[in-house]
Amino acid sequence: MRAQDLPPLPETPGVYLWKRGEEVLYVGKAKSLRARVKSYFHAEGKARRIAEEATGLDFIATRDEVEALLLEANLIKAHRPLYNVLLKDDKHYPFLKLTNEPFPTLLVVRRVEEDGAKYYGPFPEAGALRRIKTLIDRLFPLRKNSGYPMKRRRYPCLNYSMGRCLAPCVGKADPEAYQEVVRQVEAVLEGRVDGLLQELEAKMREAARRLEFERAAEIRDQMEALRAFFSTDQQAFDPEMGDLDFLGMARSGALAVVQLYQVRSGRILGRISRVVEKEEATDEEILWAFLRDHYLEASPLPPLVLLPFPLEDLESLAELLKRRAGRKVELRVPKKGEKARLLELAERNARLALETELKLRERRGEHPALKALQDLLGLPARPWRLEGYDISHLQGQARVFSIAVFEGGRPKRQEYRRMRLKAGNDDYAAMEEGVFRRYTGSLKDLPLPDLLLIDGGVGQVRAAARALERAGLRLPLVGLAKGEEVLVTPEGRELRLPLTHPALQLLIHLRDEAHQNGLRYHRKRRSEELFRVLQGIPGIGEKRRRLLLERYGGLRALKEAPLEELARLPGMSLEAARALKAALAEEEPA
């Protein structure tokens, strides 16, 4: 694209999208749209190449830089542009949600919504989330079994009898007492445990003073459980350090690891780690992408974030954090003292994580097509786990959704799955149902893939994309249409490759594995149906049943076999063949 072909650009904050046809190549934000976009034509390296490859430019003016930052993040997630830094392992880590109701409940969710609820997380380790949720359920009597929003019940549940719920669903809870419990749960989730323990100790002493010894004992047990949990589950630092996040980063060539540690009340609450593989991205671009994506959802926010090196344009991020937290959040690069030593700790651990990742890749012996696939589709890293999806049916009925899994470019058949579908003769509806159930049903806890392959054209691919959106997920996906072996994207873009291309060969193998997985189900079903019919026919014993199953496989083929052919089979007689044909004639068509 030439500079003279640019649309008129304002000197205001906003977001710009470099495009090649309908494909978005890069999304960026700017204090001045005009100055930032025009700078691409005087730049070198990646920026210059983006301008040269682009055939068009869209822009959206915003009121301020914070709005531009938010819009940039949303557009990057929506379009996953080729030249933006995309974080690997964007697996939608779970959050704890304290619902916005008169009697709130605590839920595990994977999406943060603008619904007035309070969100805590993300929790990168499922075990940590499980432990804190179990602790809260045991020690604090929030409602648990009356749904969201709360449904009225006729009788209280067992939790009420055990003292673990105040039973607001049957009108037994005092609103003021319930809100006191909510406040205590918030203190635990925000890491303000020391203050909560002091408060509980005062209540215990007051209960003892009133001779309410049973209540005092309950509070004592609650305090001991909290102390035990927070002394064993978290690494203690200096309590004077308070609440903060600190980050470390390590890099080797195109591969980088960024880690963030969350410290609350002087204790490490958790660590979040991301892997990025982007040849041309600078360290600053990688760290900025991590900060933007993490702090758009993370909650609660600390008053201090320690960065490993300075970044340009941190003012917009600091302002965004201030608006989200309702107070100032300082972004600082300490050079000495205890906080600088925290950064050294984070960098050492990021370096260890990077070395582990490199050794794992070396041991895996990654398939050479994975790098070709990454480059072809503009993925943030080599796609280690691939899942292929296929819809098959038996004579227009019994539609089946089949899943094949590759890891490191090789089949992982122990994780192949199949599911019967409810959708009728609509292939698109069947694909949407199958993909949605894969990520919300009994298979939802399987690892998320780095790339989805859909057996079909743009219609099936878009149906899969709708299912992912309904499930609250953003995963790269592509379709492979039979016949011409053309790759298609959800936007309708076609990628035509020579059959010798390693990425295409790998995807064809994956698609065929998914298809064969479905066919195996239908063969098994035909055999079971035939076995059922043969069981009730006089003169057809176990040996003859086995022979007919091996020879014909299904009911239709057996019905079409001539009488003379059946009679000539080893172990069969003309009388047995006639009995078989008579029984088959009475069988309802499949």
Swiss-Prot record:
Domain GIY-YIG: 11-85
Entry's Gene Ontology cellular component terms: cytoplasm; excinuclease repair complex
Keywords: Cytoplasm, DNA damage, DNA excision, DNA repair, Excision nuclease, SOS response
Keyword Oxidoreductase recorded: no
Record-linked Pfam families: GIY-YIG (PF01541), HHH_5 (PF14520), UVR (PF02151), UvrC_RNaseH (PF22920), UvrC_RNaseH_dom (PF08459)
Positions of transmembrane segments: none
Main location: cytoplasm
InterPro entries: GIY-YIG_endonuc (IPR000305), GIY-YIG_endonuc_sf (IPR035901), GIY-YIG_UvrC_Cho (IPR047296), Hlx-hairpin-Hlx_DNA-bd_motif (IPR003583), RuvA_2-like (IPR010994), UVR_dom (IPR001943), UVR_dom_sf (IPR036876), UvrABC_protein_C (IPR050066)
CDD domains: GIY-YIG_UvrC_Cho
Cited SMART domains: GIYc, HhH1
Subunit structure: Interacts with UvrB in an incision complex.
The family this protein is said to belong to: Belongs to the UvrC family.
Classification via PANTHER family: UVRABC SYSTEM PROTEIN C, UVRC/OXIDOREDUCTASE
The protein's name in its UniProt record: UvrABC system protein C
Source organism: Thermus thermophilus (strain ATCC 27634 / DSM 579 / HB8)
Lineage: Bacteria, Thermotogati, Deinococcota, Deinococci, Thermales
